From Swiss-Prot:
One of its GO terms (cellular component) is cytosolic small ribosomal subunit. SUPFAM superfamilies: Ribosomal protein S2. This is Small ribosomal subunit protein uS2. One of its GO terms (biological process) is translation. Belongs to the universal ribosomal protein uS2 family. HAMAP family: Ribosomal_uS2_B. Pfam families: Ribosomal_S2 (PF00318). InterPro entries: Ribosomal_uS2, Ribosomal_uS2_bac/mit/plastid, Ribosomal_uS2_CS, Ribosomal_uS2_flav_dom_sf. Keywords: Ribonucleoprotein, Ribosomal protein.
């Protein structure tokens, strides 16, 4: 089966992105042992053959999800991940959270949809000039509300149902997102470093989840997979 998987990244690309550097050996999760190649100068070195295989499996899965017409939710709120998560999700026409995970995003989706509708309605009212009929103070208050909602929900606009899969940069930091996705039965694809627990992750991509270049590389590959799946869907409907 592995031979049939798309080979979407090279060892060289991974090395250049620093994807092989794990955490100090005293900060590891023993469950990551199968993904570790060796230790050097007190740092675990990730087995990049496993990274290639993990990304290939994740790529194929994401392609299948978007080919069915479902969406991917990209999640990465750590500073190093914020820009890549937003830009790659937008490029692929998917959803993202890159500032703060709000509890209940997946497990209390009915409330989430109401907030998204409120944001949409307020922006619509502003854009057609309704705010001009209000006092300056009232208009400023509503603008502030739009800004506040956008800080949390900008990447979720248009999301009217739960995603078909979730892609996470650093599941240790995004523990709440992992728990909610697991509870809702949403498959999880994640960049998993040597200090993480891989057990809740359906598609483990073992790699450095702190290096900006590594995060950009992995996130862009997942975005490519989403785009490929959407193209397949379009072709099948022609």
């Amino acid at each position: 089966m592995t031979n049939q998987l798309p080979r979407v990244v090279t060892i060289r690309e991974l090395l250049e992105a620093g994807a092989h550097f794990g955490h100090p050996t005293n900060r590891w999760n023993p469950k990551m042992k199968p993904y570790i190649f060796t230790a050097r100068n007190g740092i675990h070195i990730i087995d990049l053959q496993k990274t290639v295989a993990g990304l290939s499996q994740a790529y194929q899965f994401i392609t299948e999800v978007t080919a069915r017409g479902e969406k991917i939710l990209f999640v990465g709120t750590k500073k190093q991940a914020q820009e890549a998560v937003m830009e790659e999700a937008i490029r692929a026409g998917q959803f993202y959270i890159n500032r703060r995970w709000l509890g209940g995003t997946l497990t209390n989706f009915a409330t989430m949809k109401r907030r998204l509708k409120l944001l949409s309605d307020l922006e619509e009212q502003r854009d057609r000039g309704d705010f001009a009929r209000l006092t300056k103070a009232e208009a400023a208050k509503l603008e502030e509300k739009i800004d506040r909602l956008n800080r949390v929900f900008a990447g979720l606009k248009g999301m009217d149902r739960l995603p078909g899969a979730i892609f996470i940069v650093d599941p240790r930091k995004e523990e709440l997102a992992v728990r909610e996705a697991d509870k809702e039965g949403i498959p999880i694809v994640a960049m998993v470093d040597t200090n993480c627990d891989p057990d809740p992750i359906d598609y483990v991509i073992p790699c450095n989840d702190d290096a900006i270049r590594g995060i950009r590389l992995m996130t862009s590959k997942i975005a490519d997979a989403a785009i490929e799946g959407m193209r397949r869907r379009e072709s099948s409907q022609e």
